[in-house]
Amino acid sequence: MRCLIFLCSGLLLSSHLFACTSAVISGRATRDGRPILWKQRDTGTLENKLVYHTGHTGHTGSTYAFLGVHNADDSANAEMFMGSNAVGFSIINTASYNLAYPQYKGKMDEEGILMKRALAVCSTLAEFEALLQATKGTRGVEANFGVVDAKGGAAFYETDPYSFIKYDANDPTVAPHGYLLRTNFSASGTPERGQGYIRYQTETDLFQWGFLGEGLSVNFILNEATTCLRHSLTGVDLARGPLPESAATPSIVSFADFIVRYSTTASMIIQGVAQGEPASLTTLWTVLGSPLTTPVLPVWVQYAEQIPPQLFAGHNRSAALNAASLRLKDRCFPLKVPEGKSYLDFGKVMNREGTGTLQKLRVVNALLVKEGTRLLEKMRSAKVTDPDVRQSYQEMMNAVGGYYASFGVDL
């Protein structure tokens, strides 16, 4: 009964307000021993861009180079919402809505500012904890911060303006299976408040199945979690139900409180490094748009200059890849009234002809992961050059362009 109350309380709250889904996975829980950090980002700002920040050394101190996702309209690149730096420190967040800090009267929603600062100056979990101590009483955040580092560290930090509580994914008493999940409430917060209880239950069921089955991996999260079409409260699984005949078959379905939904603007699966590997091998498997309409691309801080320009953007513009994703996504949500965001034309996503956006996406994603993994293995053996990276990206972008061209969308 208590679980049902949790689920219903989440259902009654807004579905689209900074409602992210995430996971911190220690190396002891993954198939290859490398930690994974995942964030499915939901926000009202649909346009995204990838941004590379160069490091520097000066009289006021040094900063690391780092790479991650910003809102497209962030002309000053002041807020980063998920990313990694040159020494393998990676960070994500989900907003929390059940922490208490009544004495704080300052500005809130500064999570992106704090994460950008952390990427610039932190190399380990311990240094992030020192940053949290240094910003006590001045940081306007209410969030679950997920962090991994190149030393095998993996943890969530439930954080308000004054305090934080660490949940260590390497501690068997905290994470018996080696992984931790968060949506939009904190375990240390007020029970039955917050948001995302339905998504949390869906995620819990999904990860338990994955952990006991094929194992937790980049492929598992990409194929099973980012595009999960199961609803844990109603029991609906759109992918397993009767599919519409074709993309042209009218097939409007209710689409609220799924892990992926209208407000999902990006997803990032950050694959850390094994013990003894260079931190530069940390890989950001990046979905720069809706997971229903956006192919995944691997990016690395050390090869930032080789990343295709379609992932970056000019002044106050979304990246070209993100813009193409949004144009295709627009067809999947044909109702343009405000409540239309909760109704999906499912035939556009999956159908019996196999022409849905997700069906074609799974084919191209398999090719992209294969090529990205091949390139990563060359990096691990120190046998890769800048021309190799450029050639690999060219092949990947040809596949991405072909995906959008099949729907008549220009990239």
What are the residue ranges of the model-derived segments?
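Positively charged n-region of N-terminal signal peptides that target proteins for export
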Residues: 1-4
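Cleavable N-terminal signal peptides
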Residues: 6-7, 17-18
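C-terminal, well-structured catalytic/ligand-binding subdomain of enzymes
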Residues: 21-77, 82-83, 89, 93-120, ...
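Short, charge-rich binding segments
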Residues: 82-84, 137-138
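Intrinsically disordered, low-complexity linker/loop segments enriched in Gly/Pro
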Residues: 110-143
